[in-house]
Curated annotation (Swiss-Prot):
Biological processes per GO annotation: peptidyl-glutamate ADP-deribosylation
Keywords carried by this UniProt record: Hydrolase, Protein phosphatase
InterPro entries: ADP-ribose_metab_enzymes, Macro_dom, Macro_dom-like
Protein name (record): ADP-ribose 1''-phosphate phosphatase
Catalyzed reactions per annotation: ADP-alpha-D-ribose 1''-phosphate + H2O = ADP-D-ribose + phosphate
Top enzyme class: hydrolase
The keyword rRNA processing is assigned to this record: no
Function (record text): Highly specific phosphatase involved in the metabolism of ADP-ribose 1''-phosphate (Appr1p) which is produced as a consequence of tRNA splicing.
Annotated residues for binding of substrate: 15-17, 29-31, 36-41, 168-174
GO molecular function, one term: phosphoprotein phosphatase activity
Species lineage: Eukaryota, Fungi, Dikarya, Ascomycota, Pezizomycotina
Pfam family membership, one: Macro
Enzyme Commission (EC) number: 3.1.3.84
């Protein structure tokens, strides 16, 4: 039996991403070096310092003992990618961080943080747009797998199932938002994407 493609529903709005409902997961793109030093990543670091500590330790662990995998994408008409390549973890993966008590105690909502490792580096070391989109495709598949595992567990650990996101990859990584949005749509995800209010 043939399956028809599933397209997600992306709702775009203006406001503050950090006003997402309690229990929601906030998605953003990350480098693999353990740095949330600029842009929206710095805002995540300021709001969720305990989550940042987990992200940084995850990166440092993989930087200290290298682990690689070969990715063989299946090119399609609209794909920017198509060549197999060797990637060093955590590139092309997702890190799902549960709410940390220090981050929400007495002042913040309980948010899950989802890091999509879409660029190996940052600044001058940022990956090319084609590599970032390929890594986004891989990381979104990994994120979906981890979310499915959460849903299979009793109680979901406070995860509401709601996915919220910034226009990831489009800031300091310099990738056209429409390309990242298409990855989310093609993955069949429902995501609320929040951009800062103009003015």
């Amino acid at each position: 039996m043939a399956h028809s493609p599933i397209h997600g529903r992306i709702t775009e709005t203006e406001g503050d991403l950090f006003d997402a409902p309690d229990g929601a997961a906030l998605i953003h793109a990350c480098n693999c070096q353990g740095s949330w030093g600029k842009g929206i990543a710095q805002a995540f670091k300021n709001k969720y310092p305990a989550a940042f500590t987990i992200y940084r330790a995850h990166c440092q662990n993989l930087l200290s003992k290298a682990s690689y995998r070969t990715v063989n994408p299946v090119p399609d008409e609209g794909s920017l990618t198509g060549n197999s390549r060797k990637v060093r973890l955590p590139e092309g993966t997702a890190l799902v961080i549960p709410p940390q008590e220090h981050d929400h105690m007495g002042r913040h909502k309980k948010h899950w943080i989802i890091c999509l490792f879409t660029s190996r580096g940052f600044g001058r070391g940022v990956s090319s747009p084609a590599v970032i989109i390929q890594n986004t495709e891989l990381a979104v598949v990994d994120m979906r797998r981890q979310i499915a595992e959460l849903h299979a567990e009793e109680g979901l650990g406070g995860f509401s199932g709601e996915l919220w996101s910034c226009r990831f990859n489009s800031g300091l990584f310099g990738v056209d938002w429409a390309l990242s949005r298409k990855v989310l749509e093609d993955a069949g995800l429902e995501v609320t994407v929040v951009s800062p209010r103009e003015g």
